[in-house]
């Protein structure tokens, strides 16, 4: 995989976003199709991309932002994992996941061993997986992920993101995904982002 062009950002990359129920954003049919997709995003990307890979940006115990802390029931510390999902040798999605340190443990989800493997594949393979409601957000132009998108692809636009809580094995995980410019989410001619 050739990824030298896409310089690795400093970890952690992401900052807080303003999340809302999907019906509060005006989305094109293509945007809604991607943002509200209930299945594994990894599997969907693999179906349309000739090459799929994951690049781990970082995974460590940190303090979540205030809003994330509320969603994680007040936990002061969480393991924060940030990755880029590549299709056809381009980053299509920036993903940020938060979970308790116990979820890294081999006796639960064994997330410490994921490295450059997809969290989605691991989660959606579990029979006890519960998927919470999807929330969406527009990413401001000054957000670090939007700046990366501009740096990498020369396009200065508000990106779209989604997130939800997953529960499995007695653990909760908060997963957010920002769709970058090469992703099909922006292929609609009536793009309103």
Swiss-Prot record:
Q: What GO annotations for molecular function exist for this entry?
A: chorismate lyase activity
- Binding annotation for substrate: 81, 119, 177
Q: Which Pfam families match?
A: Chor_lyase
Tell me where in or outside the cell this protein is found.
Cytoplasm
Reactions accelerated catalytically: chorismate = 4-hydroxybenzoate + pyruvate
- Domain of life, per the record? Bacteria
- Name the Enzyme Commission number(s) assigned to this protein: 4.1.3.40
Instruction: Give yes or no: UniProt keyword Transcription regulation.
Output: no
Query: Which SUPFAM superfamilies does its entry note?
Result: Chorismate lyase-like
Name its pathway: Cofactor biosynthesis; ubiquinone biosynthesis
Give the record's keywords alphabetically: Cytoplasm, Lyase, Pyruvate, Ubiquinone biosynthesis
Entry GO terms, CC? cytosol
Q: Which GO terms describe its biological process?
A: pyruvate biosynthetic process; ubiquinone biosynthetic process
Function, in words: Removes the pyruvyl group from chorismate, with concomitant aromatization of the ring, to provide 4-hydroxybenzoate (4HB) for the ubiquinone pathway.
Supply the HAMAP family for this chain. UbiC
Q: Which family does it belong to?
A: Belongs to the UbiC family.
Stated name of the protein: Probable chorismate pyruvate-lyase
This chain is encoded by the gene named: ubiC
């Amino acid at each position: 995989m050739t990824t030298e062009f896409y310089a690795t950002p400093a970890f952690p990359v992401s900052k807080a976003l303003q999340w809302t129920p999907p019906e509060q954003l005006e989305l094109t049919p293509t945007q809604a199709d991607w943002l509200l997709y209930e299945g594994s995003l990894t599997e969907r990307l693999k179906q349309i991309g000739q090459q799929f890979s994951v690049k781990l940006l970082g995974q460590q115990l940190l303090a979540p932002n205030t809003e994330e802390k509320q969603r994680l029931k007040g936990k002061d510390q969480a393991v924060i994992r940030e990755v880029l999902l590549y299709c056809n040798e381009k980053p299509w999605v920036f993903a940020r996941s938060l979970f308790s340190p116990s979820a890294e443990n081999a006796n639960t989800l064994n997330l410490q061993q994921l490295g450059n493997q997809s969290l989605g594949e691991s989660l959606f393979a579990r029979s006890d997986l519960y998927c919470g409601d999807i929330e969406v957000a527009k990413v401001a132009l000054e957000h670090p992920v939007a700046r990366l998108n501009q740096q990498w692809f020369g396009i200065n636009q508000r990106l779209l993101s989604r997130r939800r809580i997953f529960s499995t094995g007695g653990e909760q995980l908060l997963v957010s995904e920002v769709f970058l410019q090469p992703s099909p989410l922006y292929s609609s001619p009536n793009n309103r982002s």
